């Protein structure tokens, strides 16, 4: 399918700091520039993930330049949901970041997965203005009431991520859920984000499958929060 949608910023990328990713921030920025991106978000895993960085890593994100290789660098985290409205980084650290993703992951402190409890956890998180994006919500290991989540996204302005990796290598069984989420987002005009979930530089800006799903669902361009650098800055409440 030919895509009529786009994203100038990749809002979900991991560096060596995540422990199971394989490129430096400089390598990622260089590849992002080569692929024509105007921005890339460094969203290494929160500390509850095995081999993830210590919280002090996130304390020191200010050391990263705002621009590398001509690409805007957004400094953030992919936090782990650990309970209703709870993630594995303190609010004082979340406040320091340009953006915060939140998602369910194995072995990270979340209890037994059940649709009602999972949905409650996400809906409460979306009330927190420090949480910008719910990442890979189509993961079948953590079922959700997708309609309730899409409605909440529209109400709170929290973006739901279409994660390209969910269609390819990760979270087997996610693809149909992601397509349904895209349709619900189109129905309720919920904000969506695109992320490669790259764990190596060569995967940065890989959006093809996610874009196809958004096109098929009838998502309007203005629903994609990272369609341009300017819309990304606006979504994150950043002026420059």
UniProtKB/Swiss-Prot annotation:
Key word Metal-binding present: yes
UniProt xrefs under InterPro entries: Phosphatase_YcdX_put (IPR023710), PHP_dom (IPR004013), PHP_phosphatase (IPR050243), Pol/His_phosphatase_N (IPR003141), Pol/histidinol_Pase-like (IPR016195)
EC id: 3.1.3.-
UniProt family annotation: Belongs to the PHP family.
Family matches, as NCBIfam families: PRK09248.1
Pfam families reported in the protein's UniProt record: PHP (PF02811)
Residue numbers binding Zn(2+) 1: 12, 14, 78, 197
Keywords, comma-separated and alphabetical: Hydrolase, Metal-binding, Zinc
Protein name: Probable phosphatase Pcar_2586
GO biological process, one term: bacterial-type flagellum-dependent swarming motility
Ligand binding (Zn(2+) 2): 20, 45, 199
Cofactor(s) named in the record: Zn(2+)
Co-factor remark: Binds 3 Zn(2+) ions per subunit.
GO-annotated molecular function: phosphoric ester hydrolase activity; zinc ion binding
Positions contributing to Zn(2+) 3 binding: 78, 105, 136
One Gene Ontology CC term in the entry: cytosol
Gene3D superfamilies given in the database record: Metal-dependent hydrolases (3.20.20.140)
HAMAP family, A to Z: YcdX_phosphat
């Amino acid at each position: 399918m030919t895509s009529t949608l786009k994203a100038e910023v990749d809002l979900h990328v991991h560096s060596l700091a995540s422990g199971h990713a394989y490129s430096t921030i400089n390598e990622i920025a260089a590849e992002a520039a080569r692929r024509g991106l105007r921005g890339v978000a460094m969203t290494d895993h929160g500390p509850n993930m095995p081999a993830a960085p210590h919280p002090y890593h996130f304390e020191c994100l200010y050391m990263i330049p705002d621009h590398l290789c001509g690409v805007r660098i957004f400094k953030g985290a992919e936090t782990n949901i650990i309970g209703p409205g709870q993630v594995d980084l303190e609010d004082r650290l979340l406040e320091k970041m340009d953006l915060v993703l939140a998602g369910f992951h194995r072995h990270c402190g979340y209890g037994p997965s059940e649709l009602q409890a999972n949905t409650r956890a996400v809906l409460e998180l979306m009330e927190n203005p420090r949480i910008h994006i719910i990442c890979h919500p189509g993961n079948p290991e953590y079922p959700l009431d997708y309609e309730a989540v899409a409605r909440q996204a529209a109400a709170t302005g929290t973006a739901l991520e279409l994660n390209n990796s969910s269609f390819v290598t990760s979270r087997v069984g996610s693809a149909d859920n992601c397509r349904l989420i895209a349709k619900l987002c189109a129905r309720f005009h919920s904000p969506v984000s695109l992320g490669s979930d790259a764990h190596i530089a060569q995967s940065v800006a890989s959006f093809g499958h996610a874009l196809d799903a958004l096109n098929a669902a009838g998502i309007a361009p203005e629903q994609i929060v990272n369609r341009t650098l300017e819309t990304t800055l606006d979504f994150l409440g950043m002026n420059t």
